[in-house]
Amino acid sequence: MQALFLKIIKHSNLKILILGSDGRAHTFCWKISQSELCTKLFIAPGNAGTSQYGENLDISVTDFESIKKVCISKKIDLVVVGPEEPLVKGIYNFFKDDKKLNHIIVTGPSAHGAQLEGSKAFAKAFMQRHNIPTAFYKQFDAESYEEGLDYIKNHKLPVVLKADGLAAGKGVVICNHSVEAMGEYELIIQKSKFGEAGKKVVVEQFLDGIELSVFVLTDGNGYVLLPEAKDYKKILEGDKGPNTGGMGAVSPVPFASEIFMNKVIDQVIEPTIKGLMEEKIDYKGFIFFGLIKVDDEPFVIEYNCRMGDPETEVVLLRLKSDLVKLLIAMEKGELNREEIVIDEKSAATIVAVSAGYPGDYKKGLTIDFGYLENPETIKAIDSEGGIMVFHAGTKQEGESVITNGGRVLAVSSLADSLPDAIELSKEILDQIHFEGMYFRKDIGYEFVK
């Protein structure tokens, strides 16, 4: 196996498959294509932006048999998994248990490790076992339904209800009234509001603070700390309205001081990785720590077993190191030997969405990129900073690019200051148009004077 890695590095001939079709997938394409080790990129299923870096394949991220056929026919060396669903469904195990696939590097944990994201109850119990700071909680299901009602009725307000399983980012409800909380609890467990994901409910103490996202790449023992980010989930300006997949993100996070980040490392990151080792959970991939800062102390809101979207669009913009080399070091268990280089500049991404999102919306609308010469991407990385138009819900139709999702584009900028990066992204978005296009103009508002 060691000889295989030496051969890969020497010949620089990695064929890489990226799973995903969102802005995160496009960002991975952009970053990985810069590596001297990458000679060919494939993306399943991809979008109009990813096709500029490699070959899009019309395959679902959870169609493991079709992914297997592609990996064999294209002689894939490395699979980068974007979304959580294939990880929770066991794509890592699928590869490692197959003699034709087990030589391929897969970025992600085993199905057991992916339960950190796939089950809120599993994650909370894991944190409790390893003394990782998090909100107090209890869990209930159909059998303990009445007990849960009594618990919620007497719970201090606000109270947080979380569907145990994956619910497309919509499985968390913050309730300010007991009647509201009991109604939501009934909807989740008895009326199957979130389907299978809501068979179990985590009832959690509400923590009042400010949120941020912290990312590491781990080999199950060592790790490298990637740039932190803050995302904006609410659809409307002023952080109002329903939650979305993310309307924008910034990095670095001004309130994440060195002192605070040292607490994150000591109290959250290292106990998590130590816990994975102690419980013999296979985990080689990204860990996304959803944190909240309360009185200068970090608490874990959630784990995710992959990179975030739109956070990836700012995190990788600031990562100057070769991502592919880091992924090889991950597979070899040598991340402790790696020192990554982070750009000191600030990054901001703002997401353009379809009218009606996160509810119903139209697809198939033509995108007008205005004066931008290249509609797929802007490659203007220079001494003043850089601009990237990362595609998410887009599709190539002849000579046109059309909308194909709720979140359509993520315009990301790198500049000397956060206000400058935010303004740069807004200036570019002002040149782009499609019917009903909307974006928040207040991304990073807390940090702009």
Where are these regions (language model features)?
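Solvent-exposed alpha-helices and their adjacent loops that cap or buttress functional pockets
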Residues: 9, 34, 49-51, 129-131, ...
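Active-site nucleotide/adenylate-binding loops and adjacent lid/helix of ATP-dependent enzymes
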Residues: 17-18, 103, 116-202, 254-270
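Internal nucleotide-binding/catalytic subdomain
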Residues: 171-312
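Generic C-terminus detector
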Residues: 403-449
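Generic long, charged, amphipathic alpha-helical segments
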Residues: 367-404
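Active-site "cap" helix and flanking loop/linker of ATP-utilizing ligase/carboxylase catalytic domains
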Residues: 265-287, 304-382
